[in-house]
Structure formats: C-alpha cells, structure tokens
Design a protein with these regions (language model features):
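Short alpha-helix in the alpha/beta-hydrolase fold that links the catalytic acid
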Residues: 100, 206, 215, 229-239
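Alpha/beta-hydrolase fold nucleophile elbow
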Residues: 148-158
Length: 274
C-alpha cells in the first residue's frame, strides 16, 4: 500500500484554506451586519394597538429628525413617588416588555418603557454607537419635561444596562438599577466566542460610565445567568467600584431575575426606601 503524502497534503491545505475563507467571510459578514445580530427586535405595524390589564399612555419621543421612539408610560397604582425609566433587553418589543409594568406600578412608581430604533413601532435602526447615546439622553430629556429629576430612577436590563449607565453618567437621577449588566459590550461579545475585539464596532463601556454616576447604584444578577456571566461582568463592576455599587446575587436565577421572589422582595424594599 503506497500512501501519496503530497496528495493528502494538498487536500488538507485546500480544506484549511476553505475553512479560513469561511471564517473570514463570517467575520466580514458579522462586521457589516453586526447590528442585526446584537439587536433582535420584534417589529410591530405602526397601527398596532397595545392591550394591557392596566392603564397606560402611548408616547412617541423624537430623538432625531424623522426618528421617533415609541414608548409606553404606565401610571402607579396609587400615589406616585416618581418614575422608573426602563431600558429593556435586546429582544422583543413593548407589547411584551409592558407586561412587566405591574412589578413597578405596584410599588408606587410610574414606569416608562421605550423601544429602541428598529423595535416595535420605533423608527429607523442603529448604525453607530453614538446613536445609542443620543437616544438615551433624548429619552431622559423627555422624562425631565414631566418629572422632577429627584423623582427619576433609571433601570436597565441586559443590553439596556449600557443605555441606562450612560444616561445616569450624564444626569443626576436619584437611583440607578442595573439588572444583568455587562462590563462592556466588547467584553460581552468577546466572551461569547472566538470574536476578536477589533471586529466589534460597539464598545459601550459601562465600567467607564459608572465612574461618573453620582447616584446610588443597585445591581441585580442571577447566579446562573449563562448569557451575561455574573462573575465576568457584574462582579468585576462591583470590584471596580466597591463603595458605589450594591450588588445582589439572585440565587438560582438565570438571565431573567425579575421572575424570582428574591428579586421582587428586594426590589420592593429598595423602592420603598426611595
């Protein structure tokens, strides 16, 4: 039996070249279309009618010429202590996120949910990081037209923690709540697989923004969150700012900490103190 090592070598080289070409193609595609991977919106028709079991007001907030963000404001069940500005996660739209309103309205707060660009009934889509920061500030500016700043709480969940942390760093709300926060967007995506940092067009450095946050900071994170690892992200934030951040690890919880009794009880106590 004669083995043609040259022929085998050529085949292996062709296979390796094809593999590298596919990897390169995947990286180029990811770089060009990364917004479509990182943002996973549910698009709603402009004439979509929301239905919830509690009162709400639908609002369109202008953030740029010809760009409005659709938002829902749910009033408190009793005398309102203020408003929670809620920046949601990377999937779905307000018809789903609004189902969480009762968690906050039961605790004497109005809550404003806002859909990002490309989500729900909001216009446009994101093409650069600066648009994220612009929108976070414009939404906060809108809230200031209806509430005193000392009555505003900012809450961010998952991808929304970047929006929330930025807004808190540029303003003076009375409290910042972060649920399943990431250290930075670069770190989060790099942790998900063999994706080089230079390929990621968005940094969203939450750890930097937190340096300029002057209000109290409360972090909630599930101990079994396999999407945003609590040790790689919120623990590092706590270690970086040990005196600024109060971190609560929700035992046994995954990414959606709001589904647990521990979260609800701790949130109730927190909001009662504010």
């Amino acid at each position: 039996l004669k083995i043609n090592f040259k022929k085998i070598g050529r085949r292996l080289l062709r296979i390796l070249a094809l593999f590298l070409l596919l990897v390169l193609f995947a990286y180029v595609f990811l770089y060009i279309k990364q917004e479509r991977f990182f943002f996973n919106p549910k698009v709603l028709d402009k004439d979509y009618i929301y239905h919830f079991d509690q009162p709400f007001e639908e609002i369109n907030i202008p953030v740029e010429e010809d760009v409005n963000l659709n938002a829902l404001l749910f009033p408190s069940d009793s005398i309102s202590k203020g408003v929670i500005l809620y920046f949601h996660g990377n999937a779905g739209a307000l018809h789903e996120w609004g189902e969480r309103a009762y968690i906050y309205t039961e605790n004497n707060y109005d809550v404003l949910f806002v859909d990002y660009r490309g989500y729900g009934k909001s216009d446009s889509f994101y093409e650069k990081e600066a648009e994220i920061y612009n929108d976070a500030q414009k939404v906060y500016d809108y809230v200031l037209t209806r509430y005193k700043e000392e009555d505003i709480i900012i809450l961010g969940f998952s991808i929304g923690t970047g929006f929330a942390t930025y807004a808190a760093s540029k303003n003076t709300p009375k409290l910042l709540i972060l649920e399943a926060p990431y250290y930075s967007w670069n770190d989060l995506i790099s942790n998900m697989g063999p994706i080089p940092e230079w390929l990621i067009d968005y940094e969203i450095p939450s750890y930097k923004f937190l340096a300029d946050v002057s209000c109290p900071i409360q972090v909630f994170h599930g101990s079994k969150d396999f999407i945003i690892d609590p040790d790689e992200h919120s623990k590092r934030l706590k270690d970086l700012y040990p005196h600024k951040i109060n971190r609560s690890l929700i035992k046994g919880a995954g990414h959606s900490v709001h589904l647990t009794k521990q979260y609800y009880d701790e949130l109730k106590e927190l909001l009662n103190n504010y």
